[in-house]
Structures are given as structure tokens and as C-alpha cells.
Amino acid sequence: MSKMNGPLRVGIGGPVGAGKTTLTAALSEALRDSHSIGVITNDIYTREDAEALMRLQILPQDRIIGVETGGCPHTAIREDASINLAAVAEMERRHPGIEIILIESGGDNLSATFSPELADVTLYVIDVAAGEEIPRKGGPAITKSDILIINKTDLAPHVGASLEVMERDAGRMRCGRPFVFSSLRNRDGVAEIVKLLAEIAGLEIRSDLQVANLA
């Protein structure tokens, strides 16, 4: 459902290659049948992520807007979110009554956060292959995001990462905030993420939600 003052805006952040676009695609796929949904992607100099989503054909092309941020990608989601707010307004113009807009940031570091003016709920994706120490390094994105997604769990045995250590450290750093282990390319963990998002944002989702494997 949309908010009283417009659609629910979900910020999706994380380092380059962590799985943001895969998460955006999976959430779009899971929510498109029950909600009017759109996507805004941020890239520094291209619209590669938007084009990747269009190729997947999960949403019609007019429901995907690519933003070229230039410079530091965190600026466009935090200090000066005007370019993204303009994209939100354009999405609302195209689709009056749109209920959910997913806003995918450009790749950034652990200090990246979304401006409250831009995002109502924030999801942050990290990659097991980047090292089991990532959760304990902290930073606002790790500690304050509404949902932390620890992605690519299937790679843990190959990179020597301990999921038990990551679970312990994530629990300690997040002080009760939820986190999910996932293998997003296989759609493992997506249903749990959708359920948590629904609880946090007050969304109604189908009890028979099925998430396909699009790997």
C-alpha cells in the first residue's frame, strides 16, 4: 500500500558487486503481482543497472528509471538527493497511485546511508566473499539499516568465511535489528526479506508468496 503522502520508498544500498541489482530484481518479482511498483537505479556514469533490469523483463520499461549520479554515489542518496527525488516525482507522474518505489544506490562503502527525505525503509547488502569481518567493522549502513542482507552464502566454503562468525558479529553490531543470510541469485532468503519488509513497512503480502529461481 502507498503512504498517505505518496509511495513507500525503499532504499537498497551496498558495495559494488554485493547483489543490490539482484535484490532489486527479486523484490520486484515478488511484489509486482500485488502492488504497483517502480524502480530507480543509481550509477555514476552509465545506466547499466537499469538496463540490466530491463533485460530481465521483470517490470515494464516505463517502471524503471536510471539515474546517472556522477562523482560520489553516496551524495545522490544522502547530502543532495534532488536527482533521485526528481526521479521519484517522474515515476509518480507516469504511474499515479504507485505504491512502492525501490531506489538502488550506486556501489558505496559501509558509511553510506539514505536521506530520510528519500527513503522510508533501508536495506543494505554485503557480500560474504568480501570477508567475514565485514559485519564487525560496523558503520551506519551495517548498524542502522532496517534490514541487513548478508549475501552469497553459497561462496562461504570457497573463500574461508565463517557464517557463524558473521551471524555472531551481525547480531552484536545491530542490537536487535534484523539481518538475513541469502544467496540472492538462487533466490534463497528472498521470502524472508519480503516478510520483514512487509512487517516494517506495513505492507500486505500474499500468504502463498512464491519466489522463482531466476539464476
Curated annotation (Swiss-Prot):
One of its GO terms (biological process) is urea catabolic process. Keywords: Chaperone, Cytoplasm, GTP-binding, Nickel insertion, Nucleotide-binding. SUPFAM superfamilies: P-loop containing nucleoside triphosphate hydrolases (SSF52540). It is found in: Cytoplasm. Facilitates the functional incorporation of the urease nickel metallocenter. This process requires GTP hydrolysis, probably effectuated by UreG. NCBIfam families: ureG. One of its GO terms (cellular component) is cytoplasm. GO terms for molecular function: GTP binding; GTPase activity; nickel cation binding. This is Urease accessory protein UreG. The gene is ureG.
